[in-house]
Amino acid sequence: MNFKIKLIHLYFVLTFGLFFMMIIPPIAALLEQNLIAEIFYNLNEPLCHQYIGRSFCVFNNGMVGDCEPSNEVNAIVSTEFNYYLSSKSKLAADKFDGEYFYNRNLVGLHRAEKIEYNNDIYGYKFGVCSRDTAIYLGLIFAPLIYFILSKKIKSTPHILFAVLFLIPMGIDGLGQLLGFWESTNVMRLITGLIAGFGIGFFLYSILVDIDKKREMK
């Protein structure tokens, strides 16, 4: 029996592998599985800056949302949205062991910050930032859209197809870098999804074409 591993299968292994690497750390931290959380936060570290102010958190009430409350919300009901970070030596830098009030200057200095609110709600960030989270989701959903449109696709998209989908993310990121505006997690989510889908659709279509040619040999 001549069995060939299809490249599209490797695509799914890679994309879903990245997805699970992203969601395991906060869930493990919430379940107090500190070693597992530490391992997966460290695995994600080379892939992302992991700034908590630019990340989504999984909270102990089952909700997913911004780790850092917006300034508008904080200003309106500041007494209800007092929050601070708590780190453990297994999950973060040893010099920040214990509890301390949130300081914007400390953002990104460690990986598994614990956001706590004074209404007993707390959570941990995903393994990667909000934009990377969206990119991973876009990579996963791209094959589904390809499958739906497969009968209408006559050839592999040009590389400019992928480049066009990167433009919104590039504009958002460059504008923030140059100080024209401060992006939000919603904008990072939208532009990341667009970029992830464009890259995923382009790569997946190429892999499908290669697999078809391999089967014809």
Each language-model region and where it sits:
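Hydrophobic cores of alpha-helical transmembrane segments in multi-pass inner/ER membrane proteins
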Residues: 138-139, 193-209
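Short, charged juxtamembrane terminal tails flanking transmembrane helices
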Residues: 1, 211-217
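Hydrophobic alpha-helical transmembrane segments
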Residues: 128-146
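N-terminal signal-anchor transmembrane alpha helix
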Residues: 7-35
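Interfacial helix-loop-helix junctions of multi-pass membrane proteins
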Residues: 32, 121-123, 170-196
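Extracytosolic (periplasmic/ER-lumenal) interhelical loops and adjacent juxtamembrane/interface segments
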Residues: 31-126
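Membrane-interface helix-boundary motifs at transmembrane edges
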Residues: 2-4, 148-156
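Small-polar-interrupted transmembrane alpha-helices in polytopic inner-membrane proteins
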Residues: 14-21, 138-142, 157-177
